[in-house]
A protein has these predicted regions:
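Basic helix-turn-helix/winged-helix DNA-binding cores
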Residues: 1-89
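Amphipathic alpha-helical dimerization/coiled-coil segments
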Residues: 78-128
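Secondary-structure edge/capping motif, primarily at the C-terminal ends of alpha-helices
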Residues: 101, 130-137, 168, 172
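Amphipathic alpha-helical coiled-coil segments and their boundaries
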Residues: 105, 112, 140-143, 147, ...
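Acidic interhelical loop/turn segments
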Residues: 127-147
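Long amphipathic alpha-helical coiled-coil segments
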Residues: 167-184
């Protein structure tokens, strides 16, 4: 459902072709809500059928260009005002950590090292984005808030992965121990 609102939000800025929207999902939105070509185009068709967007012309290379309708604008504004975001995020990296006990400690630590390295690279990308100036307008301020969130989460994940790898290697009692009888 959030792909719908990501598309509506992008189209609230200006008309885009499907290809241009895909580039946003491969770029700035990749950190928050990645989406594939195979997801974007069917959702655009559903949005058009629902009267939330309309085809307004042709973009580069003859691609269909879409614009937000007044109903689409109302829908995204209502979503921003009224919807409580779901907190059930899927995190494959964390799911794997849950089962690291199946590996020997060296393999488990190596996995955590790779996770820490991934977070370091992601952090470098985000810091590079943060260092580039943008206009002082409401849109940029919103982008910067999301970027700040990404920076903080990425630093925390990097630190956690580094600390966890060290703890696993040392067979340290500081390594988080699973509690028995966990509630689902």
């Amino acid at each position: 459902m959030s792909l719908r609102y990501a598309l509506l939000g992008l189209l609230a800025d200006r008309p885009y072709s499907g290809w241009q929207l895909l580039k946003h999902f491969e770029g700035s939105l990749a950190y928050a809500w990645p989406a594939l070509h195979s997801q974007i185009y069917p959702e655009l068709a559903r949005l058009r059928e629902a009267g939330l967007i309309e085809q307004t012309g042709e973009g580069p290379r003859g691609a269909k260009e879409y614009s937000l309708t007044p109903s689409g604008r109302e829908q995204i504004e209502r979503w921003l005002r009224e919807t409580t975001p779901g907190r059930n995020t899927r995190d494959e990296a964390l799911l794997r950590v849950f089962f690291l006990w199946l590996l020997d400690p060296d393999e488990a630590a190596a996995y955590l090292d790779r996770e820490a390295e991934f977070q370091r690279r992601l952090l470098a990308d985000l810091e590079r984005i943060a260092a580039s100036p943008g206009p002082d307008d409401a849109r940029e301020r919103s982008y910067r808030l999301a970027l700040d969130f990404g920076l903080r989460v990425t630093r925390t994940r990097r630190d956690w992965a580094e600390d966890s790898a060290r703890a696993v290697r040392a067979h340290s009692p500081e390594a988080p121990q699973p509690r028995r009888n966990r509630r689902a």
